[in-house]
Regions:
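C-terminal interaction appendages of subunits in large macromolecular complexes
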Residues: 1-230
Length: 230
């Protein structure tokens, strides 16, 4: 039946666990890893994992929070990874961690703006994705070719995976992918599963979500309506 976390950690009234992370057993490797924090209000912070190496039984303050804000997710990442933030109203934003978020040296900070939210919206999840240097035209070409190959093999997922990413500059110029480049992109492809509060799901290729600078409104990840809910 397990053991109640309240018996392991001195949680205060109303305090909840937001993330549980699996760490390498060899703590000498921790210096190459970082922790990324995301809050409900759209802030994000990046710290070296070693900043949290020595934690006593009473815990440590992990992040400074404004009134009403809370941490929604914590993840292990490297500087060359992308972070994907998604909101309750179906927006998402993706950016390169090492370029867009400076490495904080302490824990007494609320971080920087990751995504700009509309009134009433909030961040509900964060995911870490492989960063792949691919032009808009290459990504469109890969998605089209991947969908064609799935249809040729009778893979029903071809109808839900492989849609073109939101139109952006250079995406309509076309690209000819060599077999080697197609294989390279395929090896780095990941999939994002977005599920609404009413149980509707959308499976999206990581190449459908373009990278941008942090702090913007992002793009539509999933349509929010009466059928789907948030």
């Amino acid at each position: 039946t397990g053991k109640a976390l309240v018996n392991l950690l001195p949680l205060e009234a109303g305090e909840v666990i937001t993330s549980i992370l699996l760490l390498p057993e060899d703590n000498e490797t921790w210096a190459s890893l970082e922790l990324v924090f995301a809050t409900r209000s759209g802030n994000i912070r990046r710290n070296s994992l070693t900043d949290f190496e020595n934690i006593n039984r009473n815990g440590k303050i992990a992040m400074k929070l404004d009134e009403g804000d809370r941490i929604v997710s914590v993840a292990i990442a490297r500087p060359d990874d992308d972070v994907l933030l998604t909101t309750a109203q179906g927006q998402c934003i993706r950016f390169l961690i090492g370029e867009e978020v400076r490495l904080f040296k302490g824990r007494d900070s609320d971080g920087v703006r990751g995504i700009r939210l509309e009134d009433g919206d909030e961040v509900i999840s964060m995911a870490i994705l492989n960063h792949v240097d691919a032009s808009p035209a290459e990504r469109v070409a890969y998605l089209k070719q991947a969908a064609q190959m799935r249809r040729a093999t009778g893979d029903e997922e071809a109808e839900t995976v492989g849609a073109e990413p939101e139109q952006e500059e250079g995406a309509d110029e076309g690209a000819d992918l060599t077999p080697e480049r197609y294989a390279e992109l395929g090896a780095r492809e990941q999939f994002v599963l977005t599920v609404s509060e009413r149980g509707f799901g959308k499976r999206t290729s990581s190449y459908e979500v373009r990278t941008s600078g942090r702090g913007g409104k992002g793009i539509v990840s999933m349509v929010v309506n009466d059928r789907n809910g948030n």
